[in-house]
Amino acid sequence: AVTVAGKAVINLCANNYLGLANHPTVLEAAHAALDDFGFGMASVRFICGTQTIHDTLEKKLSAFLGTEDTILYPSCFDANGGLFETILGPEDAVISDALNHASIIDGIRLSKAQRFRYQHNDMQDLEQKLIEASSARTRLIATDGVFSMDGTIANLPGIRELADRHDA
């Protein structure tokens, strides 16, 4: 957490929610990484920018998660831009919260999936969109967890209940 007026708070307006960027252990590890790997990449990963530290972390994440493989992205924007296109096709549908982050919206646009948008955190509208998309092979509900523009939190229990009910 970060401290504001003497009170520990979660900083939801930055990518450093918990204030770990200034934590002594993180700083010490960053200094060690600079000594071992230098500063910056020679290029983007798919050309020649992958270092052993990336491979090591991806393997450790795969072992921890029990997955065949893992890929790291340099930003959430890049991750969202690369996700939807790789898992969805024209016979699929994405049902997206109206206030989703721009990176989610752009990622969905890059996919060839049918697109539906439900009113922010409105479970009745989400259910209506799930019904409208019922002919799709796969229906994927896309939502932020915490919405960066207004700080609201997704109704994950409600979304999960509707996803289960509509096989999404």
Predicted segment positions?
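N-terminal "arm"/small-domain region of PLP-dependent enzymes with the aminotransferase-like
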Residues: A1-F39, A168
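Active-site phosphate-binding strand-loop segment of PLP-dependent enzymes
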Residues: F116, H120-A168
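Active-site-proximal loop->helix
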Residues: T86, I104-S111
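Short, small-residue-enriched loops and turns at beta-alpha junctions
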Residues: G19-L20, I47-T50, A102, M123-Q124, ...
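Conserved PLP-anchoring active-site segment centered on the Schiff-base-forming lysine
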Residues: L83-A102
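Conserved N-terminal alpha-helix of the aminotransferase class I/II PLP-enzyme fold
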Residues: E28, A33-C76
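Short, structured coil segments at secondary-structure junctions
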Residues: P90, L110-K112, H166
